């Protein structure tokens, strides 16, 4: 068993690649992350751990811009994320230089997933211990897109999805509450999904919003607090209405 446990390129007798499964476990223990695709907006949200008093919180960003029209959030090992993000940015720049056109969201997703897959079958390396949520706008159709990749190199397109810690709870919430929305409602859905698993409300949440016209913008803490207050007020009003509703006889 130990041989299959250590070797990245050797399958166990029951068909498992243990190092890939360990990388998936690193994702499950990482920060919560969520992505939501609206009709004219895409939103990324991540759980933000509290930083020491003397640390600059700007150095701990978990949402990165790959190009003017594409952004990425990840769950898992931050050092691995830095390597993958740098490789993806270089690919975006190289594509602009050689093709003279920006990459599509699907193209860069395939590139990232292909890179992750190569690290599951090469000697002297290990799988990337992170899962990514990639959002953006297609430069040709101007339509929003959301993709997810995982350490095995699998990728898929989504309307809304979550990864990282307690991702199943967030995904269940999104399945119950997702609707094709625009602007503010899309942002609120992403925040509501994170609040299902993140404690201390808005101060432990990082949100980035992208539109085709304005590109990527990270929300300030005050803006997130306003959304959280609005969500809590709506929840309180719904509970009050439920209690005040007449019981059926």
Swiss-Prot record:
Annotated localization: Cytoplasm; Nucleus
Complex and partners: The 26S proteasome consists of a 20S proteasome core and two 19S regulatory subunits. The 20S proteasome core is composed of 28 subunits that are arranged in four stacked rings, resulting in a barrel-shaped structure. The two end rings are each formed by seven alpha subunits, and the two central rings are each formed by seven beta subunits. The catalytic chamber with the active sites is on the inside of the barrel.
Cross-referenced CDD domains: proteasome_alpha_type_7
Gene Ontology biological-process entries: ubiquitin-dependent protein catabolic process
NCBIfam families: PRK03996.1
UniProt keyword list: Cytoplasm, Nucleus, Proteasome
Segments forming a coiled coil: none
Role played: The proteasome is a multicatalytic proteinase complex which is characterized by its ability to cleave peptides with Arg, Phe, Tyr, Leu, and Glu adjacent to the leaving group at neutral or slightly basic pH. The proteasome has an ATP-dependent proteolytic activity.
UniProt record similarity statement: Belongs to the peptidase T1A family.
Name of the protein described by the UniProt record: Proteasome subunit alpha type-7-A
Keyword Transport: no
One CC-aspect GO term: proteasome core complex, alpha-subunit complex
InterPro entries linked: Ntn_hydrolases_N, Proteasome_alpha, Proteasome_alpha-type, Proteasome_asu_N, Proteasome_sua/b
Main location: cytoplasm
Pfam family membership, one: Proteasome
